[in-house]
Structure formats: structure tokens, C-alpha cells
Regions:
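Hydrophobic ligand-binding cavity/cleft-lining segments
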Residues: 1-35, 143-144
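Hydrophobic pocket/interface hotspot
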Residues: 16, 26, 44, 58, ...
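Structured surface interface patches that mediate subunit assembly and partner/cofactor docking
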Residues: 25-29, 35, 39, 105-107, ...
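Alpha-helix N-cap/helix-start motif
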Residues: 29, 79-83, 111, 274
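Hydrophobic-ligand binding "helix-grip"
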Residues: 34-40, 49-98, 103-106, 229
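Short beta-strand segments
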Residues: 42-46, 56, 181-184, 196
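Conserved catalytic neighborhood of penicillin-recognizing serine enzymes
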Residues: 188
Length: 322
């Protein structure tokens, strides 16, 4: 059984090919994180929504024309990586390009569910082709059965969306983090990502990324992939200390969501987060941030107000005035 769908986008074939294959472009409409080795025999891993990552191998790559890759979901026995095939063909049409997607090797039930998914994301592809970014993905907003991995992926998506909205001219804007501008807060966050990713065995290739969003994404992708491989059982070594694995990874959710709020405040943006995700991160913060830890990494808690939402309560707990 197969699913097939076409969409017309107002871009040339080369621009469209970049939009469907390059990690920086994929994050604008389909993925939270993407690793891509774009060659025949090269692998990929795309985190589509929190807790759901597809992976496989490219079998055909014709830049500007066609890409074929195996497809499956990590951790799913009914459609594991490599169990099906996706073919995307690009055909020039007037001033635009027709994107034709065929997903083969599915059961009837899988074709129906993947049809819903591909329709959703091809609509977002068309939107990104027009506006440059399809914006927040409603499917990623409130993951079911939240755990430390899903929370980290959900909050990363939120933070990256804010970072994509920051022009380079605003990188020096002051933030509510004392004496740190936007660029410096991002640098601090990347340090936290590599430190905590290293606790799960992540390796970080050199990056040529220039935007803050791309730099954060280049660190976050291997970090979260390593945590997915390792899982949340047992403890990990964080500096000189042993910590429960889930608690150590939970620090990244605080980093992504709270610093995403910092970036938004510094650049005139708003953070959109579900109560489920914000509430999960608040509980993690209340576990990690102790009175003894105040005054160093975290300022003293400030009043949040009786009508404060969960995100406002979180940032107030970390010493920020909403």
C-alpha cells in the first residue's frame, strides 16, 4: 500500500530541494532536529514531534530533481527504520515547483496515518515556501506521556522558533540575565547542551553555522540523539556528581524554555508553550533549584502574582520578573 500527494510551491527546483533536505530548512516546517548525510548510502534522523524520530538511509539523490530514502520510526516494531520507502520528485511548473511525494511499503492502516502526517507537513512546506517559516507546529505542542526526553525536544522546538525570529542586528541586545546579551546567553546555553549531552555520550562535530538558531541546533541534535540512545534509566556523571539520568536531562528543558523566554523578552517576541509542557518544566525546576543554589546560577525567586500562568510562574521561580 502507498500514499501519494503533490503540492505546488512558489520556488525554483533548487530552492525546493534545499527546503526538503537541509537541516536548517527542515526545521522551518517539518522537524525539531535533523541529522542529514545527503548522499546515496548516507543516513538521516529527523525528530518530527517530541518522542517520535524517523530514520533511514538515502538510496537516490539527484539535487534539484529527486530524493529517495528508506523510512521508519525508532522504537516502533510495526514500522522500524528502513521498513518503507519515500520518494520525492520535483517537477518545474511555471514559476514554481510541484513536489510529488510517494510513500510505499505501508499497510492500509499505516498508509492512512502517514497520509494524515504527510498532508499536515506538506501544507507546512507550502507555507514555509511562501513565508520562509511555517511557525510553531501544533502537533509538537503538548506531547502525551511527557518524560525528560519528550520535554527536552518540545522545549527545544520552542526555543529554536524564538531564535529564528532574531535578526543578527539584535544579537547584542541586553537580556534579563545580568551582564549577558542575547549572543552570550546562547553561548552559555550551547555550553550546557554539550556538557549535558556529553553525560549521555554525545559527540559534537564542528559546525560552520552562523546564526544563533543554527548553532544551538547543531549542538542540540547530537545531544538529544545520544539521550534517546541511552535512555533515562540509572544515573549519569555530571561533573563530579552522579545524578538520576532523567533529572540531568531535565536541566536542558529548563535551559531551552527559560532562555527561550529570555530571548523573546530581549527581542520583542512571545513564547507560546502548552500548560502541559510548562508545568512539567516547572516541576523539574522545583526539584533542581534548591535554596542553597540561589545566588549563583539562579537568582532568588520573585513573586509571580495570583493570576500568573504556568510559564510566568516558572520564570519567576528562576528569578525573573515576568
Amino acid at each position: 500500500m502507498l500514499f501519494e500527494k503533490s503540492v505546488l510551491v512558489p520556488l525554483g527546483a533548487d530552492e525546493t530541494f534545499a527546503l526538503i533536505t537541509e537541516p536548517d530548512r527542515l526545521r522551518r516546517w517539518q522537524t525539531i532536529a535533523a541529522r542529514v548525510d545527503l548522499r546515496a548510502g548516507g543516513g538521516y534522523r529527523w525528530t518530527i514531534v517530541p518522542g517520535h524520530s524517523a530514520s533511514g538511509t538515502f538510496t537516490e539523490v539527484e539535487p534539484g530533481k529527486r530524493v529517495v530514502f528508506s523510512w521508519g520510526w525508532e522504537g516502533q516494531a510495526d514500522l522500524p527504520p528502513g521498513a518503507s520507502t519515500v520518494t520525492i520528485t520535483l517537477e518545474p511548473s511555471g514559476d514554481g515547483t510541484i513536489v510529488r511525494l510517494v510513500h510505499d511499503g505501508l499497510t492500509d492502516e499505516q498508509a492512512a496515518s502517514h497520509g494524515q502526517g504527510w498532508t499536515h507537513y506538506l501544507d507546512r512546506l507550502a507555507e514555509a515556501a511562501v513565508s520562509g517559516d511555517a511557525g510553531a507546529d501544533e502537533w509538537a505542542a503538548a506531547p502525551q506521556e511527557l518524560d525528560a526526553i519528550k520535554s527536552a525536544e518540545a522545549t527545544l522546538a520552542i526555543c529554536q522558533l524564538v531564535l529564528r525570529g532574531i535578526p543578527a542586528a539584535s544579537y547584542q541586545n541586553a537580556t534579563c540575565c545580568s551582564e549577558f546579551n542575547v549572543s552570550q546567553v546562547a553561548e552559555h546555553m550551547i555550553g550546557s547542551i554539550t556538557f549535558l549531552g556529553g553525560a549521555a555520550g554525545a559527540e559534537f562535530p564542528q559546525t560552520t553555522a552562523t546564526t544563533l538558531e543554527a548553532q544551538v541546533a547543531a549542538a542540540a541534535q547530537p545531544a538529544l540523539e545520544a539521550w534517546n540512545r541511552r535512555g533515562l534509566d540509572g544515573t549519569v556523571k555530571v561533573g563530579p556528581n552522579e545524578m538520576p539520568a532523567g533529572l540531568a536531562l531535565g536541566i536542558l528543558s529548563i535551559e531551552f524554555l527559560v532562555h527561550g523566554w529570555d530571548f523573546a523578552q530581549a527581542t520583542g517576541q512571545r513564547v507560546s508553550v502548552s500548560d502541559e509542557v510548562a508545568g512539567y518544566v516547572l516541576k523539574v525546576a522545583q526539584t533542581i533549584i534548591t535554596p542553597e543554589g540561589r545566588g549563583g546560577s539562579f537568582a532568588n525567586e520573585v513573586p509571580a502574582g495570583p493570576d500568573a500562568g504556568i510559564l510566568d510562574r516558572l520564570v519567576a521561580f528562576t528569578g525573573r520578573a515576568a
